[in-house]
Amino acid sequence: MRRVAIGLFFLSGAAGLVYEVVWLRLLVLVFGSAHFAVTAILTAFMAGLALGAFVIGRWVDRTPHHPLAVYGVLEIGVGASALTVPMLVGGIRPVLAALPDALGASFYTESLLRFLLALAVLLVPTTLLGGTLPVLSRLVRGSVGSAGAGVGGLYAVNVAGAVLGVVVTGFVVLPLAGAALTRTAAAAVNVPHALPSLAASRA
């Protein structure tokens, strides 16, 4: 079970950072500036990871469901919600374009509204991502003698996957395949790799 958890979390880390790179390109279109887009992406990721770890972490300690089953459902949710992000961003762009005329908003007010809308769009998938660590940590804590070593190793594997995801996305996949195919490929990692989790939870 521990090896299954490690392998799954490596892939999850890779897919998560693929989304971050692709969403950055999308939000540049919303803000018209990479500076504001990076701020929104980092805020959404940090807020979502914290919220997911807190809420789902508290819940998973009380649920009778197997951690791998919960993890599988979370990953399916990540993949499905991530695929809706481009549609949601496309939907808010006309709204944002109409804001200055409709509200007579200042630059700072308009930027704040853009930021809040972008945060709302990204909060669901990032919160689900945040829930994956406490869920798998529960599984690892039960299979190794040292909780610190088990959870620390799990986190290290996830970060290693994230590094690979950034490098491969930025230098290989995006230039060759484009943003649309890249985000679809990331979702294709989330959903199928959730299936072994669900199967292993029944073993």
Where are these regions (language model features)?
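Alpha-helical transmembrane segments of multi-pass membrane proteins
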Residues: 1-203
